[in-house]
Swiss-Prot record:
Name of the featured protein: Ethanolamine-phosphate cytidylyltransferase
Sequence ranges of Polar residues compositional bias: 189-201
GO MF annotations, alphabetized: ethanolamine-phosphate cytidylyltransferase activity
Entry annotated with the keyword Lipid metabolism: yes
UniProt binding sites for CTP: 239-240, 247-250, 277, 325-328, 354-358
Length: 404
């Protein structure tokens, strides 16, 4: 177990002075390529109770039921631990959620999104807890999925960037990525009821939908806490694209620089990131990157669309005490100047070595190297989902009749 230190009372199952029992909530999953959709699910789950425990599956279990994960289990444990709504992480959680697991961790119920998770033989992994009435559902976040992110990496296009329309080429690729050659594993046609819910023979759970950023979503993710007297304001800036372990390790080290840190992360505009990263970077647009970083427990505030050069105006406005950068290359601004010139002049610039070598480039390389495996994984996953949906509809059909 990996506890995140939210208080001994919570871990013990007590609320405090009145010794009132707290509600302990269980979530589990692969949490591979963690994005703001995962974070939003955990945020919703935490709101249903007082203490959130998250079980993460092993590489072996994921490979057996879904296909090879992008990240190792140790990387995935650490990513989930860094999400601010998580109180405790349970490594090597079983793929099928049972009452035994909930009882072992003293959890009242488990929470999952309104999509389906199936075993290798097509069974609902939450069937047992659903039948026992210890299952709760939260809304799946529209507009983001591992499928979509992998598709963006494999197809070199900038259509996902802010203020740009999705190109027909990207839409065609996104719609077909992971789509099985036949609607069902046996190649059978889908019933009219299922077909109406699954246009083009695609699962409603695996695929791409449009992400619509709202102010409410940002408010839900933000802490809303201003810097307090005695806190050290630390500023970091970058793309923070595909928010990953390398970012978490860096921010964790930054967090250790002060007894009471208040970390502000400045996120550059998509066009600025593309200037210094090239290709089709950033993989995630500014709105998506904002939510990903806001979900991190080591970040207090985010500047959306921060200037590339850290100016005197910015430092004065936020009353910044320290400015930090990792060991990645510092690319000059458009005019050739050092973007950290002002904090260096003030003597408040620190370069941090987090000890992690993982970068967004390396993640993309992992995906490209294993492209065929990931596409096959999605085809297998979607075929199982469609077969499950078809079987469910047939069970719901009136005896001796067709589904209307």
């Amino acid at each position: 177990m990996i506890r995140n230190g939210h208080g001994a009372a919570s871990a013990a199952g007590l609320k405090g002075p009145g010794d009132q029992r707290i509600v302990r909530v269980w979530c589990d999953g692969c949490y591979d390529m963690v994005h703001y959709g995962h974070s939003n699910q955990l945020r919703q789950a935490r709101a249903m109770g007082d203490y959130l425990i998250v079980g993460v599956h092993t590489d072996e279990e994921i490979a057996k039921h879904k296909g090879p994960p992008v990240f190792t289990q140790e990387e995935r444990y650490k990513m989930v631990q860094a999400i601010k709504w998580v109180d405790e992480v349970v490594p090597a959680a079983p793929y099928v959620t049972t009452l035994e697991t909930l009882d072992k961790h003293n959890c009242d119920f488990c929470v999952h999104g309104n999509d389906i998770t199936l075993t290798v033989d097509g069974r609902d992994t939450y069937e047992e807890v659903k039948q026992a009435g210890r299952y709760r559902e939260c809304k799946r976040t529209q507009g983001v999925s591992t499928t979509d992110l992998v598709g963006r990496m494999l197809l070199v296009t900038k259509a996902h960037h802010s203020s740009q329309e999705m190109s027909s080429e990207y839409r065609e690729y996104a719609d077909s990525f992971g789509k099985p050659p036949h609607p069902t594993p046996a190649g059978d046609t889908l019933s009219s009821e299922v077909s109406s819910q699954c246009p083009g023979g695609q699962s409603p759970w695996t695929g791409v939908s449009q992400f619509l950023q709202t102010s409410q979503k940002i408010i839900q993710f933000a802490s809303g806490k201003e810097p307090q007297p005695g806190e050290t304001v630390i500023y970091v800036a970058g793309a923070f694209d595909l928010f990953h372990i390398g970012h978490v390790d860096f921010l964790q080290e930054v967090h250790k620089l002060a007894k009471r840190p208040y970390v502000i992360a400045g996120l550059h505009f998509d066009q600025e990131v593309n200037r210094y990263k090239g290709k089709n970077y950033p993989i995630m647009n500014l709105h998506e990157r904002t939510l990903s970083v806001l979900a991190c427990r080591y970040v207090s505030e985010v500047v959306i669309g921060a200037p590339y050069s850290v100016t005197a105006e910015l430092l004065n406005h936020f009353k910044v005490d320290l400015v930090c950068h990792g060991k990645t290359e510092i690319v000059p601004d458009r005019d050739g100047s050092d973007p950290y010139q002002e904090p260096k002049r003030r003597g408040i610039f620190y370069q941090i070595d987090s000890g992690s070598d993982l970068t967004t480039d390396l993640i993309v390389q992992r995906i490209i190297k294993n492209r065929l495996e990931y596409e096959a994984r999605n085809q297998k996953k979607e075929a199982k989902e469609l077969a499950f949906l078809e079987a469910t509809k047939q069970q719901e059909a009136p005896p001796g009749g067709e589904i209307d």
